[in-house]
Each structure stands twice: as C-alpha cells, then as structure tokens.
C-alpha cells in the first residue's frame, strides 16, 4: 500500500479521466440515436448500472480485506453513494423527478469531486480507478439521460433538489455525529483543495456556508436553461409581433 503512486491533480491520468467523462456520454447517446434501438439504450443503461454497483461492492471488499477501515467508515453516506442510487433509478424509471436530483447531485456535487478529488493515490492504484469509476459514472449517466431523453431541470426542480439535499444533510449529519466520520464533508473541509477550502474553519458557520454553496451551485446549474427559456420567449414574442404587423 505504501508504494502506491501519489495522485497528481491534472496530470495525464486525471486529464484522461476528465476527457473520457466528457466524450463517453456523447458517444453512447450518438449510438442510441443512430440505431434508434431501445434495446441498445437498455443495454447501455444496464452496463452503466452494473459498473456503478459492482465498482462500489468491489471497493467495500477491497478496503475491508486491507483492514484499513472499520464499519463506521464504510457506510454508504457520501453524496456520491446516494448519487449512484439516484442516477440508476432515474435511468431505469425514466422519471423526470429522479433525473432532477441526479442532475443537481451529479453535476453539482460529483463534478467537484472529479475536478478537485480528495484522493491520495494515483493511477494505476485500484483506489484511483474505483474513485473515478463511481464519480464519473454518475456524471456519464446524467448527461446520457439529457442527450437521449431530452431531460432538463425546471424552476421547481431547484426546490425539489434542495429538499432532497436537506434530507441528505440531516441524515448524514446524524451519522457523522454518531460515527465521528466526516461523510459529506459536513463536519469539516476536505483535505484536498476545492471550493470548500474558502469556507470558514468555524463550525457550525462552515455548515451554514456549505448550504449557501449548495444553493449557489443549484442556481448556476439551472442558469443556462433559464437563459435559454428567456431567449426563446423573447424570440417567440418578437416573431408574434412581426406576424401581427403583416
């Protein structure tokens, strides 16, 4: 374990992972569109779901076999753990409301983990592979749904996503207090540099600021769709006025 390579932020392996995360959902969605096959789409969903589940189970088996963590550190209480469940449910049920949560958690939370990972070990260590398989798999699943099923967030999506996030915060904070582990980084900031590094070291002020950051991310993630909707309404209104004058 001690001879594992050290993770280098934005080194070649990290950049390769980011590139694959960006490109792969477009490739998969392009395959579905070209074939117009529901069987292909279901197969892709099955593969993505299986990879996410098997990777998580393999991670638990490996860390348990190494004896590096006890049960309190192995609970499925990280946001990406919940994100795995949500994105799998969204892919299989095809329900907009599950997608909304997967979108805000997957793009807002998991994307931060991909860009600024709290990770000590580099490629080809299994912890590097497992970490990015789970986090990138969530993002790939979310973007795949957006491209193939035209899913997108709406104004009320922010409210529903926020309520689900508050539920996660409450449950996870209780677990953190009981176990003493920092699930969801609710007790203190992660070691790796990230947006959370700018928050206060004082708790519970840090937790309050964390809520503000989460809400800001939600608004930023919805902003492109709000701009598109506003531009579309303006275009339609302008076209209607022109037709009325003819």
How should each PLM-predicted stretch be described?
Residues 115-168:
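A contiguous pocket-lining binding segment that forms or flanks enzyme active sites
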Residues 17-29, 81-92, 136-148, 209-225:
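Hydrophobic cores of alpha-helical transmembrane segments in multi-pass inner/ER membrane proteins
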Residues 32-45, 92-98, 149-158:
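Membrane-interface helix-boundary motifs at transmembrane edges
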Residues 64-71, 92-97, 117-129:
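Membrane-interface helix caps and helix-loop-helix hairpins in membrane proteins
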Residues 4-22, 161-163, 167, 179-218:
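Membrane-interface transmembrane-helix boundary segments in multi-pass integral membrane proteins
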Residues 51-61, 106-118, 165-174:
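Aromatic-anchored segments of alpha-helical transmembrane domains
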Residues 41-47, 74-78, 99-107, 131:
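Cytoplasmic-side transmembrane-helix entry/capping segments in multi-pass membrane proteins
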């Amino acid at each position: 374990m001690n001879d594992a390579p050290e993770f280098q932020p934005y080194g070649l392996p990290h950049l390769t992972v980011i590139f694959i995360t960006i490109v792969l959902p477009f490739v998969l969605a392009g395959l579905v569109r070209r074939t117009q096959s529901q069987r292909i789409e279901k197969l892709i969903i099955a593969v993505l779901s299986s990879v996410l589940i098997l990777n998580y189970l393999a991670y638990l088996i490996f860390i348990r076999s190494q004896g590096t963590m006890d049960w309190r550190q192995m609970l499925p209480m990280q946001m990406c753990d919940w994100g795995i469940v949500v994105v799998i449910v969204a892919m299989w049920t095809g329900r907009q409301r599950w997608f909304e949560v997967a979108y805000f958690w997957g793009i807002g939370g998991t994307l931060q983990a991909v860009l600024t990972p709290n990770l000590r070990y580099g490629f080809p260590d299994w912890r590097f592979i497992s970490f990015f398989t789970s986090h990138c798999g969530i993002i790939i699943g979310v973007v795949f749904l957006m491209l193939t099923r035209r899913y997108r967030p709406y104004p009320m999506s922010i409210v529903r996503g926020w309520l689900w996030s508050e539920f996660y915060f409450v449950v996870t904070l209780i677990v953190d207090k009981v176990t003493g582990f920092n699930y969801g980084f609710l007790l203190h900031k992660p070691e790796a540099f990230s947006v959370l590094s700018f928050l206060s070291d004082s708790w519970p002020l840090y937790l309050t600021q964390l809520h503000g950051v989460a809400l800001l991310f939600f608004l930023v993630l919805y902003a492109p769709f709000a701009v598109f909707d506003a531009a579309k309404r303006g275009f339609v209104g302008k076209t209607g006025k022109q037709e009325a004058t003819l």
